Amino acid sequence: MKKLLLVSLLGAIAATTANAGSTTIQPYVGAGYTFLNNDDVDVHFLGLNGGLQFNEYVGAEVFWNKSVNDIEFDGDLDEFGVRTDADVQYYGIGLTAKYPLANNFYAKGMAGYARVDLDVDATFQGYTVSTSEDDSGLIVQAGAGYNFTPNLAAEVAYTHVSAFDGFNGINAQLKYNF
């Protein structure tokens, strides 16, 4: 529900600003890949984001990422016949910062709030036990981007999510500016 509300709010703001011809607010959408890990697990995500660039330096963004790999936990019990299946997603909102550099490059950063949802199924001899857990915390990104055209950019960033004792990794994405 929160995701739907955030995306709806972003769409309403973007539609309003699209009609205000003299505004400098620029909406964008993006899609990308994120790899996050901590001491217990490695997770690969595909995700979507959308945002508003308020001026050359400051913006706001909403994001959603869903795990796409077979997540294996340290100490998995496969050798005992227990099969685990996990699904992770994280979503949230953040403030973004950009600083133009030379030759279409720019430095970028984001700080915000992220919620992480974890669903795990464990199956043993035909019996399945399911559990869900969620946590929230800060998300911080620091990286760089390159503008191929005024509308198309690529970004790479170090990412830290503090939920569930912290995850660190890398994010790569393509963005389209309207």
Question: Where are the model-predicted features located?
Answer:
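Cleavable N-terminal export/targeting peptides
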Residues: 1-26
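Short glycine/proline- and aromatic-enriched beta-strand/turn motifs that initiate or cap beta-hairpins
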Residues: 19-70, 91, 97, 115
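Residues that define the transmembrane beta-barrel architecture of outer-membrane proteins
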Residues: 25, 42-46, 87-91, 134-140, ...
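Repeated loop/turn-to-beta-strand initiation elements of outer-membrane beta-barrel proteins
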Residues: 27-29, 57-62, 103-107, 146-156
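Outer-membrane beta-barrel translocator domains and adjoining extracellular loop/strand segments
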Residues: 39-45, 70-81, 118-129, 164-172
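Membrane-embedded beta-strands of outer-membrane beta-barrel proteins
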Residues: 48-50, 93-95, 142, 154, ...
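Residue-level signature of outer-membrane beta-barrel architecture
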Residues: 52, 97-99, 146, 160, ...
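Outer-membrane beta-barrel "beta-signal"
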Residues: 146, 153, 167-178
